[in-house]
């Protein structure tokens, strides 16, 4: 009861003592908290054991002055002790509070009583805590005052009022009346002193011991009565003390106020009196201090008088000063105004002069133009020549107004001769390039200059020359010529292709260019400089649900050497995303530090206009190029980002060439892209490009794909983003075509990485990739090879510009045309991805990097790589594939291949032997997509029939990548037949390809699973989830690794997935980052973190391999049982998504070599589908301004499952375990079956 009484007293009694206590507590709760803790501990001991240990009293209380109670502990009744303790505590607090209360406004006489009541609740927390902490929860007697209250609530006050309403009122009265007993304060204070000297711990035992006893309601009442009596006495004392304190405080406050007031007044007076009177004021300060000291004395009135006088003086002085200051300010203002007026007059005069000068200049220019026109009219011998060189002449004639008509004619003849020479040279070069095509690409990395002129460029140039005329050829005769013509080209572009021939003439002719032309050049240069200037670019990564995963992702570009070589530079732009791609090119590539744009979540990019992206590295990453400004005049140029980056010309060329030449080239590229678009690209592709990306994107894409590619022969851009629409044309044929294109592109990018390998090898490579299946693929791939991209499984979300794909260039003209269409669809589309719906025209980031809309394509020199990998199927041609693959998104796989040579070799082999496997594996998503996308499109045979399966087995490789986006919605569920037949065919194929690498077969299985999952992937989340699950299955370890890897850098996850599914990892890089990271990883010059990640992945792979082997053993058994069930199930339960995606995936997966475990794959696939369905919807980076196509949107949500969306943060071990458990549980039903 003592404790209870104490708490009530402190809380509810509003006497001075309580008030002072509470104010003190409010002012120093830290000390109270410490004391409370100690008190609680001791009380808990005493109460729990019911022992009276004289030492139980907390030191806390000892400080409070409880030592004085020691004498009474055993002499007095527990109630008395308790009340004494309460009194002592309150007194001690009052004592301690005297000083602070005197300072605090709370104790002012007016507010004292109110403040006391208000503040009082602060203290209760302490005693009540003691009691509640004591831990004795006695049987509660509601009639009695609550014994232990955990918190301050109304219950105590209610009980108090109910039990002793009168006494409480009396206590209030006492407080008012009992202001006399000031002497009690001394006694109270003396107790604390004794307490400090005494043994602080003896009171409490009795104090707390009383609490257990109050179970008796009667005893409790007695104690309460006694307590209340003592409380009243205590209240009286406290009130008296409070009154005393108030008086003292009032006096002190009054004195302080007086002093302050006097000082202020004196200061004012001193200010008024001025500096001269300051000495007397100082003299007065002594009396002031004396007055302050004797403020309480009667002499205070005199001080006030003096202060008044001083104040008056100070005020007068202040008035004088103010007047003076005002006068000075007015003078200053006048002077300033005069100065301003003078400046204005001068400016006006200058402006007038400038205007006059401008008028004169304009008049002179007009005269010059008139003269030029006259000369032109005279010189117009051959109208054609005049048309071609009309503008050049004007510039030259302006410069040489006095030149005669003969000179003008001579100039025209010179120009014609120069143009004809340039054209001849260009044609010769093209012929040479044609001859060197097979060799050229192999030599490409070594000879950037040749690369520029390699077949793709030659083809483009020829086509463009045929279409756009010889001027383009003249413009692009060579890097040197381009540079020479660069300054004039921007103008030429603006003026038209006809004037293309003029720039060289003008350069030679005009020592000083026309002012207009100079202005234009300066503008272009500025634009180029701006674009080439590496600038950090920041973007936000957000999940589909407006949740900002990364408020700021910084892209800081590393500026590449401008002179590294056009090809190198173009490759660099692409490499920035898949930096590994650049291993082929020794030249320093400009790789942004954040080559991985997608932070593990999705593409992080704010939806920005392409024009907003200034960083060349960024642009190259995004596939934007300098072209922007060049294209701007063209109208398509504004989109510049995708194509240019691809071409890399934006990045590399501008650096290599003068900015103006770069811009001119970009413009020409756009023009050529348009021409090529119309002529080269399939009508579908061109239409698609035009319709979907919009004219800008199409020209941009083509420009980039072709023009830039020409500029920059196959670049090692590993990843390209393909708009889903391009991947999956609206029609199945288009889809298949695109899939083939995509695949060919993937394969080509494989080539691209090792562009050196002949561009033509890609078709062979395609065949090699397909091996058996690839042959059917081969036919397709030739068309597709041009684009040479791979879809990273989930990287489609990754915004990666595909550089002009060397494979595209490499591809034979047939391929080039076919693939050019597909390329236009793929390559151009990739730049266009921004415009996937044609909506994106404006922003590269505008691309909703969602699996649905874009698939990231891993570009590989598939021909060379595949050939090599065929040769070294087990080795995986880590050398060729390693660097190129490393360069390519697969590069990671190759890295993996290097690390796991067999495992990777298989993945590589998959990449290559089943080039589609690689494509499909790498774009496991693409693979799943191809299958999932439209059953027919995935395979060249669009029929979902077993036929298709067979074709799929052969073709799926190519198809898978093409379908990588897997718009399963588009693809009708692959026919169960195809599913059924495919798995076996695929198994055979996968076994063939997979045999070289048993571990890859596991990955293949995983890939198969992933592809199976991905078939659901059309419900994008499933695919991603599938990937995750694959990763989870493959290595729950990988889970942590993989999610963290995405966070760390998709490399780990991608590699881990690679280890598990050698190919899939790339695709698996569910975070667009994965693909880029893979590429980075693969890059020969890997950052430390990449190598470390690879090492970790090796460990993961090994563990996963063992786990997967076990899993496969189990699953193989289950698969045999369930294979039939699975086929039916996948057809039935999978229904559209499973059968469609599943069958497609299976067909793709089988080609991937993952089919060997057909039943197992199906089981896993089913499990993953189930999981995917259960998994949260995807996280998407909503960067794009344009909305993805409806089906794409559906996929988008699914594509990025939240786990993938969260890739940014690594998965904690517990999360991986949880996922593992979830998977195990999800597998139970199948196991039971």
UniProtKB/Swiss-Prot annotation:
Any one GO cellular component localisation term in the record: cytosol
Tissues/organs with expression: Expressed in intestinal epithelial cells (at protein level).
Signal sequence coordinates: none
Predominant subcellular localization, coarse grouping: cytoplasm
Source domain of life: Eukaryota
Biased amino acid composition, Basic residues: 157-176
GO biological process: epithelial structure maintenance; maintenance of gastrointestinal epithelium; negative regulation of barbed-end actin filament capping; positive regulation of actin filament polymerization
Annotated keywords: Cytoplasm, Phosphoprotein
Modification type Phosphoserine: residues: 7, 28, 132, 420, 556, 975, 1017
Extent of Acidic residues compositional bias: 363-376, 397-407
InterPro entries attached to this UniProt entry: Actin_dynamics_regulator (IPR052853), DUF4592 (IPR028030)
Biased composition (Basic and acidic residues): 200-211, 282-293, 302-322, 329-362, 432-447, 505-527, 677-707, 768-783, 908-921, 994-1040, 1059-1082, 1099-1124, 1151-1170
Coiled-coil segments on the chain, per record: none
Stretches with biased composition (Polar residues): 732-742, 815-825, 852-863, 1047-1057, 1174-1183
Compartment(s) of residence: Cytoplasm, Cytosol
Ranges for region Required for interaction with actin-capping proteins: 321-472
Ranges of compositional bias, category Low complexity: 876-889, 956-967, 1127-1139
Region described as Disordered: spans on this chain: 92-136, 157-224, 269-527, 560-586, 629-788, 815-1082, 1097-1186
Residues modified to Phosphothreonine: 559, 971
Summary of subunit composition and partner proteins: Directly interacts with actin-capping proteins CAPZA1, CAPZA2 and CAPZB; this interaction decreases the binding of capping proteins to actin.
Linked pathology: In colorectal cancers, CRACD gene is observed to be often the target of inactivating mutations. In the absence of genetic mutations, expression levels tend to be down-regulated.
Described function: Involved in epithelial cell integrity by acting on the maintenance of the actin cytoskeleton. Positively regulates the actin polymerization, by inhibiting the interaction of actin-capping proteins with actin.
Protein name: Capping protein-inhibiting regulator of actin dynamics
């Amino acid at each position: 009861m003592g404790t209870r009484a104490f708490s009530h007293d402190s809380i509810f009694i509003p006497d001075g003592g309580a008030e002072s206590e509470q104010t003190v507590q409010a002012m120093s709760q830290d000390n109270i908290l410490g004391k409370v803790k100690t008190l609680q501990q001791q009380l808990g001991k005493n109460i729990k054991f019911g022992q009276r240990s004289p030492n139980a009293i907390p030191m806390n209380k000892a400080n409070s002055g409880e030592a004085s109670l020691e004498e009474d502990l055993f002499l007095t009744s527990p109630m008395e002790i308790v009340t004494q303790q309460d009194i002592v505590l309150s007194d001690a607090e009052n004592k301690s509070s005297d000083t602070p209360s005197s300072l605090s406004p709370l104790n002012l006489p007016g507010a004292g009583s109110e403040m006391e009541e208000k503040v009082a609740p602060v203290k209760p927390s302490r005693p009540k805590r003691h009691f509640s902490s004591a831990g004795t929860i006695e049987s509660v007697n509601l009639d009695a005052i609550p014994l232990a209250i955990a918190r301050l609530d109304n219950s105590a006050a209610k009980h108090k009022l109910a039990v002793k309403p009168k006494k409480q009122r009396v206590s209030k009265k006492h407080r008012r009346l009992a202001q006399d007993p000031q002497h009690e304060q001394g006694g109270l204070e003396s107790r604390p002193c004794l307490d400090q000297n005494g043994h602080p711990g003896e009171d409490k035992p009795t104090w707390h011991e009383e609490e257990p006893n109050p179970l008796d309601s009667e005893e409790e009442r007695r104690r309460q009565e006694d307590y209340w009596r003592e409380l009243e006495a205590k209240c009286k004392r406290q009130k008296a003390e409070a009154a005393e304190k108030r008086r003292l405080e009032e006096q002190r406050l009054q004195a302080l106020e007086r002093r302050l007031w006097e000082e202020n007044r004196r200061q004012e007076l001193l200010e008024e009196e001025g500096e001269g009177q300051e000495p007397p004021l100082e003299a007065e300060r002594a009396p002031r201090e004396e007055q302050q000291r004797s403020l309480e004395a009667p002499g205070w009135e005199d001080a006030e008088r003096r202060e008044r006088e001083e104040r008056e003086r100070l005020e007068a002085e202040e008035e004088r000063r103010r007047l003076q200051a005002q006068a000075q300010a007015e003078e200053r203002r006048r002077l300033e105004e005069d100065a301003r007026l003078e400046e204005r007059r001068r400016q006006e005069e200058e402006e007038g002069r400038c205007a006059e000068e401008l008028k004169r200049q304009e008049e002179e220019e007009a005269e010059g133009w008139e003269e030029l026109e006259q000369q032109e009219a005279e010189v117009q011998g051959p109208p054609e020549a005049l048309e071609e060189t009309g503008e050049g002449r004007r510039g030259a004639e302006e410069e040489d107004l006095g030149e005669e008509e003969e000179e003008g004619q001579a100039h025209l003849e010179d120009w014609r001769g120069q143009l004809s020479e340039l054209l001849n040279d260009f044609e010769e070069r093209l012929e040479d390039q044609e001859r060197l095509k097979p060799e050229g690409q192999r030599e490409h990395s070594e000879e950037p200059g040749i690369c520029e002129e390699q077949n793709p460029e030659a083809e483009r140039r020829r086509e463009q020359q045929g279409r756009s005329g010889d001027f383009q050829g003249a413009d692009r005769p060579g890097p040197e010529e381009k540079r020479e013509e660069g300054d004039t080209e921007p103008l030429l572009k603006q003026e038209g292709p006809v004037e293309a021939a003029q720039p060289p003439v003008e350069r030679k002719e005009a020592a000083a260019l026309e002012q207009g032309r100079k202005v234009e050049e300066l503008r272009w240069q500025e634009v180029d400089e701006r674009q080439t200037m590496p600038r950090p670019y920041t973007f936000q990564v957000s999940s589909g649900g407006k949740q900002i995963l990364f408020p700021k992702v910084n892209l800081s570009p590393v500026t590449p050497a401008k002179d590294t070589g056009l090809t190198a530079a173009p490759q660099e732009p692409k490499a920035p995303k898949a930096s590994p791609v650049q291993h082929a090119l020794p030249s320093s590539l400009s790789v942004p530090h954040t080559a991985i744009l997608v932070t593990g979540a999705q593409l992080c990019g704010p939806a920005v206009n392409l024009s907003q992206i200034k960083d060349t590295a960024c642009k190259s990453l995004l596939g934007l190029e300098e072209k922007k400004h060049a294209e701007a005049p063209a109208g398509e140029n504004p989109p510049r980002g995708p194509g240019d980056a691809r071409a890399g010309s934006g990045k590399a060329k501008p650096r290599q060439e003068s900015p103006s030449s770069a811009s001119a080239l970009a413009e020409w590229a756009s023009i050529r892209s348009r021409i090529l678009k119309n002529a080269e690209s399939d009508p579908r592709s061109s239409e698609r490009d035009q319709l979907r990306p919009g004219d800008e994107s199409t020209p941009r894409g083509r420009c980039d794909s072709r023009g830039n590619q020409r500029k920059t022969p196959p670049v090692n851009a590993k990843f390209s983003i393909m708009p889903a629409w391009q991947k999956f044309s609206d029609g199945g044929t288009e889809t298949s075509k695109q899939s083939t294109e995509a695949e060919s592109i993937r394969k080509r990018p494989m080539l691209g990485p090792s562009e050196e390998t002949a561009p033509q090898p890609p078709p062979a490579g395609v065949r090699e990739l397909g091996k058996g299946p690839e042959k059917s693929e081969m036919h397709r791939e030739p068309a597709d090879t041009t684009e040479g991209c791979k879809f990273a499984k989930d990287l489609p979300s990754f915004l990666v510009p595909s550089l002009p794909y060397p494979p595209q260039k490499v591809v034979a003209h047939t391929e080039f045309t076919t693939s050019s269409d597909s390329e236009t669809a793929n390559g151009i589309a990739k730049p266009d991805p921004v415009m996937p719906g044609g909506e994106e025209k404006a922003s590269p980031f505008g691309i909703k990097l969602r699996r649905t809309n874009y698939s990231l394509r891993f570009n590989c020199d598939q021909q060379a790589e595949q050939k090599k990998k065929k040769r070294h199927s087990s080795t995986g041609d880590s050398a060729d594939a390693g660097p190129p693959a490393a360069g390519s998104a697969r590069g990671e796989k190759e890295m993996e291949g290097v690390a796991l040579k067999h495992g990777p070799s298989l993945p590589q082999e998959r990449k290559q032997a089943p080039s589609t496997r690689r494509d499909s594996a790498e774009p496991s998503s693409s693979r799943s997509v191809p299958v999932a996308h439209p059953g027919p499109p995935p395979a060249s045979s669009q029929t979902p029939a077993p036929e298709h399966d067979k074709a799929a087995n052969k073709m799926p490789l190519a198809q898978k990548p093409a379908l990588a986006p897997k718009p399963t919605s588009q693809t009708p569920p692959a026919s169960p037949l195809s599913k059924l037949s495919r798995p076996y065919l695929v198994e055979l194929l996968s076994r063939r390809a997979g045999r070289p690498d048993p571990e890859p077969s596991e990955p293949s299985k995983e890939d198969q699973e992933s592809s199976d999952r991905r078939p659901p992937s059309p419900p994008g989340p499933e695919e991603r989830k599938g990937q995750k699950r694959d990763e989870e299955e493959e290595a729950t370890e990988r889970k942590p690794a993989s999610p963290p890897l995405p966070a760390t850098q998709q490399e780990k996850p991608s590699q881990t997935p690679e280890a598990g599914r050698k190919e899939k990892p790339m695709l698996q890089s569910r975070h667009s980052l994965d693909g880029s990271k893979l590429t980075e990883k693969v890059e020969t010059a890997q950052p430390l973190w990449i190598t470390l990640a690879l090492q970790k992945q090796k460990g993961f792979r090994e563990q996963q391999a063992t786990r997967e082997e076990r899993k496969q053993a189990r699953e193989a058994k289950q698969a045999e049982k369930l294979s039939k069930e699975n086929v039916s199930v996948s057809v039935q339960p999978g229904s559209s998504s499973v059968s469609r995606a599943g069958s497609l995936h299976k067909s793709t997966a089988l080609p991937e070599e993952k089919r060997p475990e057909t039943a197992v794959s199906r089981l896993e696939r089913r499990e993953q589908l189930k999981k995917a369905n259960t998994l949260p919807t995807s996280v998407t980076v909503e960067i794009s301004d344009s909305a993805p196509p409806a089906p794409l949107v559906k996929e988008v949500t699914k594509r990025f499952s939240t786990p993938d969306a969260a890739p940014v943060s690594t998965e904690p071990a517990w999360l991986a375990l949880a996922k593992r458990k979830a998977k195990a549980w999800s597998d139970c039903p199948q196991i039971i079956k």
